[in-house]
């Protein structure tokens, strides 16, 4: 059984690796790790010409020993990456899905 500390490390590693994939040098990928309250985010900040770019790409929380994915703007899906690292599906909640729809997935309901 994985520990919360392992979950923290997995999340931080995945967000750090994802931050290296910025496609434009005018865009900053910022990782935000609140390890006391278990909130983790990857945010893009910058400008493309006169257009402001700002957005949360990934937002994960650890709540009651489960990983809650609040936002996932990736194609591969961070839930799949967590499973590949050995995190059981019953410890991952797709928080961006409505609660009444979560039982249709292989992941935790909440």
How does the language model describe each region?
Residues 1-110:
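Terminal domain-initiation and capping elements
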């Amino acid at each position: 059984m994985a520990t919360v500390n392992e979950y923290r490390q997995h999340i931080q590693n995945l967000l750090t690796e994802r931050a290296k994939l910025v496609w434009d040098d005018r865009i900053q990928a910022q990782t935000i790790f609140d390890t006391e309250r278990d909130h983790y985010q990857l945010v893009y900040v910058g400008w493309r010409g006169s257009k402001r770019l700002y957005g949360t790409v990934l937002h994960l929380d650890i709540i009651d020993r489960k990983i809650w994915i609040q936002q996932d703007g990736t194609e591969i899906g961070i839930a799949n990456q967590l499973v590949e690292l050995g995190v059981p599906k019953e410890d991952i909640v797709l928080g961006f899905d409505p609660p009444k729809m979560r039982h249709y997935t292989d992941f935790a309901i909440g």
